UniProtKB/Swiss-Prot annotation:
Residues spanning the signal sequence: 1-19
Disulfide bond positions: 45-57
Family from the record: Belongs to the DEFL family.
Subcellular locations according to the entry: Secreted
One GO-annotated biological process of the protein: killing of cells of another organism
Protein name (database record): Putative defensin-like protein 312
Source organism of the structure: Arabidopsis thaliana
GO CC annotations, alphabetized: extracellular region
Record carries keyword Signal: yes
UniProt KW keywords: Antimicrobial, Disulfide bond, Fungicide, Plant defense, Secreted, Signal
Length: 69
C-alpha cells in the first residue's frame, strides 16, 4: 500500500508541476511527439529529464518495496 500512496503523491506532484510550468500549453505535443523534437527551450528539456529521473526513482522504490515485503 505504501507504494500505491507514493504513486498517488507522484501523480499529484506532476499535475502541480504541469499547471505551474509553461510546458502545460504544449503538453499534448510533448507526449505525442518525440521529446527531443519538442525541446524548444532549456526549461522544457530539464523538465523532461527531471520527469524521467523521477519516474525511474518511482519504479526503483516500488520494486524495492515489493522485494522487502
Amino acid at each position: 500500500m505504501s507504494c500505491f500512496s507514493f504513486l498517488v503523491y507522484f501523480l499529484l506532484f506532476i499535475v502541480t508541476k504541469m499547471s505551474q510550468s509553461p510546458l502545460s500549453q504544449s503538453s499534448h505535443e510533448f507526449t505525442v511527439v518525440s521529446p527531443y523534437l519538442s525541446c524548444f527551450g532549456i526549461e522544457e528539456c530539464l523538465f523532461y529529464l527531471y520527469f524521467k529521473l523521477y519516474d525511474l526513482c518511482v519504479i526503483l522504490l516500488c520494486t524495492w518495496f515489493d522485494l522487502s515485503e
